[in-house]
């Protein structure tokens, strides 16, 4: 089962964001319990590695509501956040993926703040074989695409 997600970005109401995650997680857990393979990909509108500012040297000290670190502790057992797993494997110094999202508050000049906002969350019966951000230098959008290749266990 593939979920295409675009979670709420703006506003300081943490309850709305938590409710969206809870709904997604319940749907994902139900599908996994039914024996299905589960992948949820899209724009989570949170920092999906938790340290994007450090990785990309962002100039902005203030973290907007949509750029806050994701609640990784809330991810259900048996599911993995692809971007965080890659960061955990490589460490900050070894994480070389391009940002998936840039500050769109001004024209892009290569120095805009960047984050990893787009990723996949997959179930334990899905085995990733390749994961990366496709670095298009934000030519078409304020987001870069993310590619996940996987096999079903």
What are these regions (language model features)?
Residues 1-153:
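Active-site regions of metal-assisted phosphoester/phosphodiester hydrolases
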